[in-house]
Amino acid sequence: MSLSHLYRDGEGHLDDDDDERENFEITDWDLQNEFNPNRQRHWQTKEEATYGVWAERDSDEERPSFGGKRARDYSAPVNFISAGLKKGAAEEADSEDSDAEEKPVKQEDFPKDLGPKKLKTGGNFKPSQKGFAGGTKSFMDFGSWERHTKGIGQKLLQKMGYVPGRGLGKNAQGIINPIEAKQRKGKGAVGAYGSERTTQSLQDFPVADSEEEAEEEFQKELSQWRKDPSGSKKKPKYSYKTVEELKAKGRVSKKLTAPQKELSQVKVIDMTGREQKVYYSYSQISHKHSVPDEGVPLLAQLPPTAGKEAKVPGFALPELEHNLQLLIERTEQEIIQSDRQLQYERDMVVSLSHELEKTAEVLAHEERVISNLSKVLALVEECEHRMQPHGADPLTLDECARIFETLQDKYYEEYRLADRADLAVAIVYPLVKDYFKDWHPLEDSNYGTQIISKWKSLLENDQLLSHSSQDLSSDAFHRLMWEVWMPFVRNVVAQWQPRNCEPMVDFLDSWAHIIPVWILDNILDQLIFPKLQKEVDNWNPLTDTVPIHSWIHPWLPLMQARLEPLYSPVRSKLSSALQKWHPSDASAKLILQPWKEVLTPGSWEAFMLRNIVPKLGMCLGELVINPHQQHMDAFYWVMDWEGMISVSSLVGLLEKHFFPKWLQVLCSWLSNSPNYEEITKWYLGWKSMFSDQVLAHPSVKDKFNEALDIMNRAVSSNVGAYMQPGARENIAYLTHTERRKDFQYEAMQERREAENMAQRGIGVAASSVPMNFKDLIETKAEEHNIVFMPVIGKRHEGKQLYTFGRIVIYIDRGVVFVQGEKTWVPTSLQSLIDMAK
């Protein structure tokens, strides 16, 4: 067999210039002999593997091979083998026929011999070389080696339970006979010569494949093998759209819709083509022709290299395609527009039906309103007819109120929207004037309150109105009270005497919840207060027998803070009257006591310190303490003011004018061989003259404890003990008893304060509980109405200064320091409160 096929060019021709050159291109012969095991191969020598193309090739040095490889015979004639059509010609042939027109190739028509044709190369060819290299029919004597062995395999199988003549496996499910092989007729691929199943296979597996399916699969695979993916023609694909799909799409094509106003005058520069184009609206772009800028190139115009690969379209009409596309889009848009118009008409029908229902409701409502207005007009005309003078059935105020109640109950909407002011002026005002023509307010203060209360509910608007001309004109009841009722009140107040306050106070109390608030304020501010102020200016506390509080204080519930301008002249006149007053005159207390709860705590304390406390100090200074003959009148006069002046002021008087003299008398008495029983009684007697509140004061406690210490020192001396045996024990017992009383009193006070705090804290938030000493001082200041505030920009040793009433203090580590004459003195919280009062 010649090896000339290894030295052919890409098209199967021999290379005349270099016969020894091996071409590595894949030819048609290579493709056809791909599965041929008998094809000739060139075995590479060791020298060729080492030196490659520079190796020296010598036919004499070639090794003999078992595959029948032999040296090249140059004496044989030259033969040519047809390699079929060229690639270009094959492609042209394929492009002329479509897949649909191809003749189906059946398995019967497939060539039986896919290998290369036999070459006539001369006499050196041996027929024995037709077989496979080194191949033998080994399946004929399969297992024959067991003849020359000990049969160990058969013995092992029998030990494991194998029975000759039966299949392998637990249930003998294995095959008995060995697998048969079927020899293929030719050298083609699998299945090229029909079914290759043996008789044994058909018996064991009787299910056969469908011939039609196999044929169809074969044609499909064959067609795919022969097609060119880049240049093959495909069947046209059609896309269908239903009406529902077009409705779901629901949009109008840009080419058919009118441009928007804001986009109709936009300048657009199109640079998508080879040349720049200018459009003056987006709508012009939508009408841009779909034909490409350059025509379809002809075959003659194509470059030589492109002519082999590119294919010329056989049918290209872009204008026709464009027109067809326009028709399709126009039809789609007509369908969409028709659907939208149908939906619009349906919505219009629903909307008109709703409007019809609403119109019917409005019509029925208007008919009811007309009917109600006609009935209201009939009632008003009846009232006007009965209002005529000298009528047979004159209208009264009560009957008119019932008619208005009917209007309000049955025809509320019409009554609420009607102009009640004009209706009341025409009908109600004359009746009210006639009703109050003989009225005396101070004699019968409740006259007309019920009927006016009824008219208030009928005529007054829902909202609360203030005093203004607009509100007065819009609210019928306010106008009624101002124009009809108010003139009667003005006449009565003009004739009223302020010292006779009870009738006027009762009258205003009866009408306060009926008349408008602004009318009541006008009466109090413009009518009552000027008369009271004038009467206070004319009042003289020395000559007037009627106390001023008797005709001023009854106005407190009605006027409250309006009376504060009267307090200043009252205090001034009382101060003038007390200049020559003596504590023995008890009438001053009767005059001043009602003012204690009226005046503020600060102003009251200032008034007491200015006018009363100095007088009491002079009286207490005149007190003579005589254990043998004591006159207590001056002491009683002073202690009688205990509830009028503060405890701190009273204690200050006692410290200054009483206790020094009292302790001096005690020391004198103890130095003259006294009777300690009498001294004890005298001590207890004076202590019983003070109230518990005064005795609880620290200064008073200190003074009485000082007296006990003096008595203990006196009784501890030898002279006193010798003069009166047992006195020391009595004084010690007295001291112990007094100290125990003080302790019990303090414990009781603490318990009371704790109970008060517990009761007060039931509904109090946790934030109100004082968290530090400053908060505690602030709480106490609020309880005693004492001003507690920081002094801006003032500090002492870095501590903020505060004003506690009239006292300047600062707080350092939970201790209050009070400013003294030269230094800061620490003090207790109770002492601070007493000093501030």
Curated annotation (Swiss-Prot):
The modification Phosphoserine is found at S2, S59, S95, S98, S144, S210. GO terms for biological process: biomineral tissue development; negative regulation of protein-containing complex assembly; spliceosomal complex disassembly. One of its GO terms (molecular function) is nucleic acid binding. It is found in: Cytoplasm; Nucleus. Its main location: cytoplasm. Residues 149-195 form the G-patch domain. Residues 91-100 have a biased composition (Acidic residues). A motif (Nuclear localization signal) lies at residues 700-705. Residues 1-50 are annotated as: Required for interaction with DHX15. SMART domains: G_patch. Pfam families: G-patch (PF01585), GCFC (PF07842), TIP_N (PF12457). Keywords: Biomineralization, Cytoplasm, mRNA processing, mRNA splicing, Nucleus, Phosphoprotein, Spliceosome. Residues 1-13, 44-64, 101-116, 217-231 have a biased composition (Basic and acidic residues). Identified in the spliceosome C complex. Found in the Intron Large (IL) complex, a post-mRNA release spliceosomal complex containing the excised intron, U2, U5 and U6 snRNPs, and splicing factors. Interacts with TUFT1. Interacts with DHX15; indicative for a recruitment of DHX15 to the IL complex. Interacts with GCFC2. Belongs to the TFP11/STIP family. This is Tuftelin-interacting protein 11.
